[in-house]
Amino acid sequence: MRECISIHVGQAGVQIGNACWELYCLEHGIQPDGQMPSDKTIGGGDDSFNTFFSETGAGKHVPRAVFVDLEPTVIDEVRTGTYRQLFHPEQLITGKEDAANNYARGHYTIGKEIIDLVLDRIRKLADQCTGLQGFLVFHSFGGGTGSGFTSLLMERLSVDYGKKSKLEFSIYPAPQVSTAVVEPYNSILTTHTTLEHSDCAFMVDNEAIYDICRRNLDIERPTYTNLNRLISQIVSSITASLRFDGALNVDLTEFQTNLVPYPRIHFPLATYAPVISAEKAYHEQLTVAEITNACFEPANQMVKCDPRHGKYMACCLLYRGDVVPKDVNAAIATIKTKRTIQFVDWCPTGFKVGINYQPPTVVPGGDLAKVQRAVCMLSNTTAIAEAWARLDHKFDLMYAKRAFVHWYVGEGMEEGEFSEAREDMAALEKDYEEVGADSAEGDDEGEEY
């Protein structure tokens, strides 16, 4: 088996976790108490969904997941919510006081009190796996727990499970809306610390998702539930190939192999289509060609940046539902002729395709329409550097005046860590610039890696 353990850190991670597990349960026909009426073989480990669920002797399916937060309120909602019976109480780990939007508290002072407990629980989950494939870590960049504790956890996971892949789903601070003033600090500190420990990080920017909800789903004032349900659809598309059998199945390690040309350049851009409300879907065809084209619209991306200004290094199209390879090939051929999509010259237009016959499931009473087919595109493009540049600029404005730095130093950090992290980010921006540059200029660029 190729099991995956999901780790949900901090408020954002936990709430996205709720949306994801709700959707997984619907997709696999698992009831909120973990029973699965359709599954007659108790203890049979041959079904694909067992990558995400373990099965007890009593036939109860338990998510291979850990929820961690340094303060209890958010996870208490899981403990009392609809899915309270789904999780083992030991999988829901809470501290007493929160990280107060402070990376240093999450990483040093408060985080270190709880890290061993968390690793112990993860170890128990890992011991139940026959062939652990890797970890999916969900967190935000802006929060104290999401940034500080996640980076601590990633460092420790690298030590304990050296070769296992670690994929992140990170909530990137939105360009316009902000939930905390110190988001740029936390984001840059966590990116710097996690850069060498993460194999692949899918970033999601709340503002981009807000816009999609407003524009495509006609929700005037999207709530976090709306956002998280949309994010969970994307996560579900990415993980569908691990949980269902399909024609062209994609494995966790396959993502990395196909999307990450250099170890540091591991931030693919996710795009999902069709995001459409039930009223509209009723009148539309949504052919393979249409949804494939929609993936190349900046409006459907999960991070605000413009790939038309950047170059693509790799592209992965994950289809699910009623899709045949013939249609996919035709759609891709059309896109290649358009020439609006520029690939770097050292990577001929490679599209990796995954097809899964399980149609997309929607949460009843949710906003998304039930459709026959959907596609999630993961593309590694140099345009994502725009997102880093934006964040770095905000960091610089605050750090020039050393604003808020004393909160971090007071928790045992040193100012040097800030400048070190910022230099690393500058190097990352430079890496993106060099990858996008034409290789004809000089062949001596390969020495860095």
Swiss-Prot record:
Classification via CDD domains: alpha_tubulin
Source taxonomy: Eukaryota, Metazoa, Chordata, Craniata, Vertebrata
Domain of life: Eukaryota
Reported cofactor(s): Mg(2+)
Organism of provenance: Mus musculus (Mouse)
N6-acetyllysine sites (modified residues): K40
Domains (record comment): The MREC motif may be critical for tubulin autoregulation.
Gene behind this protein: Tuba1c
Positions annotated to bind GTP: Q11, E71, S140, G144, T145, T179, N206, N228
Protein name: Tubulin alpha-1C chain
